[in-house]
C-alpha cells in the first residue's frame, strides 16, 4: 500500500513539474516569436528610437524642457524613445 501511494505521489509530482516546464517553454517561445520583428521593421524601429532620443538630447543641452519629437504612425516619444502606442 505504501509503495503504491509513493508511486502515485511521485508520478503526480513529476506530471506537475513537467506541465509547468512545458507551459513556461511555450510562453517563452511565443514571446520570442512576437519579440523578433523582421529586419526591415527592426531598422525602422531603431531609426525612430535614434531620431527621438537625439532630438530630446539636443533640447536638453540647450537648457530647455525636452519637447519630445512627435513620432508618427502609432508611435509616441516616451523616456527619450519612440514607443508603439
Swiss-Prot record:
One of its GO terms (cellular component) is host cell postsynaptic membrane. Expressed by the venom gland. Keywords: Disulfide bond, Neurotoxin, Postsynaptic neurotoxin, Secreted, Signal, Toxin. The keyword Disulfide bond applies. Residues 1-22 form the signal peptide. GO terms for molecular function: toxin activity. Pfam families: Toxin_20. The keyword Signal applies. Disulfide bonds join 52-66, 56-77, 71-82. It is found in: Secreted. SUPFAM superfamilies: omega toxin-like. InterPro entries: Hwtx-2-like (IPR012625). Residues 23-48 form a propeptide. Its main location: secreted. Neurotoxin active on both insects and mammals. Belongs to the neurotoxin 12 (Hwtx-2) family. 02 (Hwtx-2) subfamily. Monomer. This is U4-theraphotoxin-Hhn1a. It comes from Cyriopagopus hainanus.
